[in-house]
Amino acid sequence: MENIMTLPKIKQVRAWFTGGATAEKGAGGGDYHDQGANHWIDDHIATPMSKYRDYEQSRQSFGINVLGTLIVEVEAENGQTGFAVSTAGEMGCFIVEKHLNRFIEGKCVSDIKLIHDQMLNATLYYSGSGGLVMNTISCVDLALWDLFGKVVGLPVYKLLGGAVRDEIQFYATGARPDLAKEMGFIGGKMPTHWGPHDGDAGIRKDAAMVADMREKCGEDFWLMLDCWMSQDVNYAIKLAHACAPYNLKWIEECLPPQQYEGYRELKHNAPAGMMVTSGEHHGTLQSFRTLSETGIDIMQPDVGWCGGLTTLVEIAAIAKSRGQLVVPHGSSVYSHHAVITFTNTPFSEFLMTSPDCSTMRPQFDPILLNEPVPVNGRIHKSVLDKPGFGVELNRDCNLKRPYSH
């Protein structure tokens, strides 16, 4: 009889944060909205707060960067560690150190699903439908997968069953699709800058932006719009039709997460051939099931916000059962190891975090070391062939551990 590998138990979980309202500004990392001045990601982008003129010009003005980066590290009895980052900051540290630790420490490093289910059920009374608590749970879940991979000496994608393709091809999200084309990406997704409070003039301005980029990028390069929950269904339908002459591939997250009937209406009335996508700010498996039922074309969960890798795999199965694509929102290596195993993810997103989109900067810079970036718009599976998620924590960052247990 062959010997079975004996797996260690988890000795301790620790939580740090960087950036956010109680620390240094512009820290970047897991909270990638926390950038310095003159960055495209904070330049008059349409949001649900844009209708208030005091908060129209900058997303940081209404506090998009107040949370900061949460770093969760889990240590096994043999001294090996796994870690992950997300957006939850100091408050996420409290949840990990004062509540979730009891479900983690003492468990086997392979008990990921058990820990995940216990965290979800234990926080139901204060987690609502996602948000900060789910971001924190997601970060713990990712750290557990990282630890498990490092203990058994395998990359996470092999723990999920292995790659179904040799490489991941990417589109780029940022203000300059024309530069993304030069870098080898298959498409470029731009933020909208106007919303319902701007009326038809706003539609004309955003449609003109798409027209300009279509002229610069040529006929075949994908162009998409990210609306970041800033519209109502009537405005979204009008904008979609205004952009149809420029072969807009999809229109994304036009409505707030819970407006399922609105998404159904938008999909029904969108121009033929234009896809409707959403999911970035949905925070539970149940919400993705309901979103899938609206008939949208692509679901876009963020693995750092939706419940972690454990939930992302379940979301992909829901999408696959309906013939839908699942294309996660950004998330770097945490997405890479998942999507290369999904048959319904033919491409993925790369978020441009350089201020003017002119250079390739790792999404979670500077908190991750050895974080890969696409080369000619692609990442080969061999780049992912390192234990766990294949990245290391940059301990030279200003890490703060406000709580312990």
Swiss-Prot record:
Q: Where is the active site?
A: 329
**Superkingdom of this entry's organism?**
Bacteria
| Amino acids binding Mg(2+) | 226, 252, 280
Give site residues, Transition state stabilizer.
Answer: 349
The record's GO molecular-function terms, alphabetically, read:
L-rhamnonate dehydratase activity; magnesium ion binding
Residues annotated as transmembrane? none
Q: Does the keyword Iron apply?
A: no
EC number(s): the record gives: 4.2.1.90
Q: Which Pfam family, any one of them, does this sequence belong to?
A: MR_MLE_C
- Which NCBIfam families does this one have? PRK15440.1
Name recorded for this polypeptide: L-rhamnonate dehydratase
Q: Which organism is it from?
A: Escherichia coli O6:H1 (strain CFT073 / ATCC 700928 / UPEC)
The gene coding this protein? rhmD
